[in-house]
């Protein structure tokens, strides 16, 4: 079926990946790495029926090599349809010194099949998913401890033992002088200070924000004393669910923002960083905006993580936050890609003009981050769902003053992305009859520049 083939091509490699992870967990350390040579050998010796690999013969070979019982896996991921959704919570029990985890699962495919049986005649939705899920808890001593949850019911509580009786040492994000003092003490031979510094992962540090004046210029938010007290009393750093990628599922897990910040700054796994960025994007605050801005600035992050952080800043451009997310987006773009233009007011003001530097696309990671910043700025809306005038003016300036004369790469796709972003600002989220003279003026100018650039590039 040509309509079904794209879905099969998408699901098949994912199921094979899950099978490889399961085989590794069941004792076959090489997973499919031991199965594939057997299949090649069967093809060479002519043992393979009609020289074609079938599902049953493949699974039989997997069972013969690993000795694992794959019937449950086959029923759920090959013969069955759908994917689970897990809703998880974690609570620390100080009396028993353990973490109580509640896992509730849902099967959207089964729910849909019950509500629309006529549309699910050919499907075989799985109503209850079973298997093991790895939970990685980063405790106070900085050591990640892995625990395995055996999922068998729709709702189940797990008592996860806690290993560390250690009062944690956290980074004090608003007092960089403390880090400098600790470093000086460590250099002088203070073993306790050296140990404290060793527990801090400085791989994603940002030296620019060590200067107090720079922090003020960037409006960097710091944790309050209440936040720091809560953080100091927290028993663990953060928790990751399905750390070994054994499930093709949607996992919803809630933890405080400071734990997501720790995960983003201290976990070197790109998937963990992405999960932290997405979670923080749904928790807009001054701290979130500063953290995501720092993520964009630190070039050691994978460029797509930096791009996702830029998109998350658009969610922090809220009136009650004084549009801090938009301010940080403008600061990021002006600092890296704009000329220093004299301005009567504050050079960091949202009203300050943005005149771009000549294009330089030699750094491809930086190029994609640049495009992400442009689209993130274009996503900012006011409480009526309309794009801000300063956003449209910013995009118009990018088109008007674009200079590609010294760039060794063409800027066609770059200009197209700006035009696309500018066109998006003309579409309100809620188009219920709201307009002002300023909106109409800049919208008309935006439309004219869009048509002009489209004519020039066409």
Regions of interest found by a model, annotated:
Residues 1-104, 110-112:
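Amphipathic alpha-helical substructures
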Residues 86, 91-219, 235-240:
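Beta-strand-rich binding/interaction modules
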Residues 260-268, 293-301, 327-342, 355-363, ...:
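HEAT/HEAT-like alpha-solenoid repeats
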Residues 265-273, 301-309, 322, 362-370, ...:
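Helix-start/N-cap signature of alpha-helical segments
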Residues 278, 311, 375, 417-420:
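Residue-level signature of alpha-solenoid helical repeat scaffolds
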Residues 282-283, 315-320, 379-384, 421-432:
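Residue-level signature of the C-terminal ends
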Residues 287-295, 322-332, 386-394, 432-445:
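Short sequence/structural elements of tandem HEAT/ARM alpha-solenoid repeats
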Residues 450-457:
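Conserved small/polar residues in nucleotide/adenosyl-binding loops
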């Amino acid at each position: 079926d040509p309509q079904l083939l794209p879905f099969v091509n998408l699901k098949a490699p994912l199921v094979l990946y899950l099978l490889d992870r399961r085989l590794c967990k069941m004792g076959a350390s090489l997973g499919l790495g031991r199965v594939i040579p057997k299949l090649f050998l069967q093809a060479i010796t002519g043992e393979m029926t009609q020289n074609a690999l079938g599902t049953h013969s493949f699974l039989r070979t997997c069972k013969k090599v690993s000795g694992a019982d794959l019937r449950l896996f086959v029923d759920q991921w090959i013969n069955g349809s759908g994917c689970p959704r897990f809703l998880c919570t974690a609570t620390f029990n100080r009396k028993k010194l353990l973490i109580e985890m509640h896992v509730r699962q849902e099967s959207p495919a089964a729910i849909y099949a019950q509500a629309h049986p006529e549309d699910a005649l050919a499907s075989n939705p799985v109503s209850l998913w079973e298997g093991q899920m790895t939970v990685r808890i980063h405790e106070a001593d900085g050591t990640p401890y892995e625990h395995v949850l055996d999922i068998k019911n729709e709702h189940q509580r797990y008592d996860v033992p806690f290993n560390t009786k250690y009062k944690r040492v956290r980074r004090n994000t608003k007092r960089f002088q403390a880090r400098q003092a600790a470093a000086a003490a460590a250099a002088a031979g203070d073993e306790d200070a050296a140990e404290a510094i060793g527990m801090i992962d400085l791989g994603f540090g940002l030296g620019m924000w060590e200067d107090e004046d720079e922090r003020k210029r960037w409006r960097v938010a710091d944790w309050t004393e209440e936040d720091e007290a809560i953080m100091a009393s927290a028993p663990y750093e953060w928790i990751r669910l399905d750390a070994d990628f054994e499930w093709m599922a949607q996992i919803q897990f809630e933890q405080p923002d400071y734990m997501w910040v720790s995960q983003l700054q201290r976990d070197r796994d790109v998937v963990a960083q992405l999960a932290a960025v997405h979670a923080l994007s749904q928790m807009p605050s001054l701290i979130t905006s500063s953290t995501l801005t720092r993520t964009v600035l630190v070039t050691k992050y994978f460029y797509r993580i930096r791009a996702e952080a830029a998109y998350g800043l658009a969610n922090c451009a809220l009136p009650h936050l004084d549009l801090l997310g938009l301010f940080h987006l403008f600061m990021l773009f002006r600092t890296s890609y704009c000329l220093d233009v004299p301005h009567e007011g504050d050079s960091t003001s949202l009203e300050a003009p943005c005149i771009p530097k000549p294009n330089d696309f030699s750094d491809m990671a930086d190029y994609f981050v640049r495009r992400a910043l442009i689209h993130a700025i274009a996503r900012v809306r006011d409480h009526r769902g309309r794009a801000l005038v300063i956003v449209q003016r910013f995009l118009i300036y990018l088109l008007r003053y674009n200079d590609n004369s010294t760039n060794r790469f063409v800027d066609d796709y770059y200009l197209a992305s700006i035009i696309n972003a500018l066109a998006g600002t003309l579409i309100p989220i809620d188009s219920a009859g709201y307009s002002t003279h300023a909106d109409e003026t800049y919208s008309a100018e935006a439309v004219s520049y869009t048509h002009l650039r489209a004519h020039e590039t066409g």
